[in-house]
């Protein structure tokens, strides 16, 4: 059984208040996109934009990409997932992952320990709770005593795992319904997807800078790369992908506290690999390479203000293909 090709978008959009997203979501549906995938870091939470979309756009599939396994209690997470399943029957998918030590530990004061087991345990708990079981269990990373959901759901939604390296990628295929990947090139997809297994959904957040101004691309792209690829989980990911030698000067400068030197150490061709940019046709062709290499659900994230993001949405619409 092959996984259908879908057309997602990352939401919410920078510079657009949540209450103003209705017309954006309605246009996204009209343009032929199939999915909205929310991000959660230092802005909106992952669920609220999707709850709004559930009411505003009854045709769109809604997914979190991703919810950290650490930052909500087990029961609270199950209740939130169940609420989304009821709000958008047959249209909700849960993306869950470790997140990073920055978000979990530095921002939320929670120990970032045993990430693989934490995600695995959370998936197992959610499957039991959403099935209506009364859960009492000593998991490896947390314990639950006597919890039963007070609302019924008619289905367990697809659960996808944010994954970078082989262990978590295999977990995504073994205990999840697929993987959510990001910060990788189109060619990197070929190294990642086989670890998940066959007939699994692969959602990719792909960063898109909708301009052919090379100077702007280098300026914005290098700063985005420096901000992410110095986070330990992403540094380890790119070392595994074979970029250790390329990125070592950036890592060394960052560790020394020289942010300017770290940014300057990023090669231009790495920006070209990790940030999709160019003319509308060049962007479309680059995004198509991700799909050709195994991504079933691209979810472009536009690194742009509202006007440029709206323009890019229209230029890259599935209805234009």
Language-model segments: residues:
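Active-site-adjacent structural elements that line small-molecule/cofactor binding pockets in enzymes
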Residues: 1-321
């Amino acid at each position: 059984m092959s996984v259908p090709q879908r057309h997602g978008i990352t939401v919410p959009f920078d510079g657009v208040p949540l209450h103003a997203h209705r017309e954006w979501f309605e246009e996204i549906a009209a343009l032929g996109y199939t999915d909205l995938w929310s991000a959660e870091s230092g802005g909106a939470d992952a669920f609220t934009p999707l709850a709004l979309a559930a009411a505003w756009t009854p045709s769109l599939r809604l997914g979190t990409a991703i919810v950290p396994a650490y930052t909500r209690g087990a029961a609270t997470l199950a209740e939130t997932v169940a609420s989304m399943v009821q709000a958008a029957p047959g249209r909700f998918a849960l993306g869950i992952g470790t997140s990073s030590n920055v978000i979990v530990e530095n921002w939320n004061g929670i120990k970032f320990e045993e990430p693989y087991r934490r995600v695995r345990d959370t998936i197992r708990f959610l499957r039991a709770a959403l099935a209506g079981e009364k859960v009492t269990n000593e998991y490896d990373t947390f314990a639950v005593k006597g919890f039963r959901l007070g609302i019924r759901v008619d289905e367990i939604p697809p659960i996808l795992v944010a994954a970078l390296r082989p262990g978590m990628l295999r977990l995504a295929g073994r205990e999840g319904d697929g993987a959510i990947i990001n910060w990788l090139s189109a060619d990197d997809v070929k190294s990642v997807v086989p670890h998940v297994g066959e007939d699994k959904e692969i959602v990719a957040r792909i960063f898109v800078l909708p301009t052919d101004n090379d100077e702007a691309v280098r300026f914005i792209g290098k700063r985005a790369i420096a901000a992410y690829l110095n986070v330990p989980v992403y540094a380890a990911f790119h070392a595994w992908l074979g970029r250790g030698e390329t990125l070592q000067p950036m890592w060394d400068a960052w560790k020394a506290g020289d942010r300017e030197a770290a940014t300057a150490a990023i090669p231009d061709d790495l920006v070209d690999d990790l940030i999709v940019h160019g003319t509308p046709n060049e962007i479309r062709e680059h995004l198509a390479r991700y799909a050709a290499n195994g991504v079933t659900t691209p979810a472009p994230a536009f690194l742009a203000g509202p006007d440029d993001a709206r323009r890019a949405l229209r230029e890259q619409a599935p209805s234009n293909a």
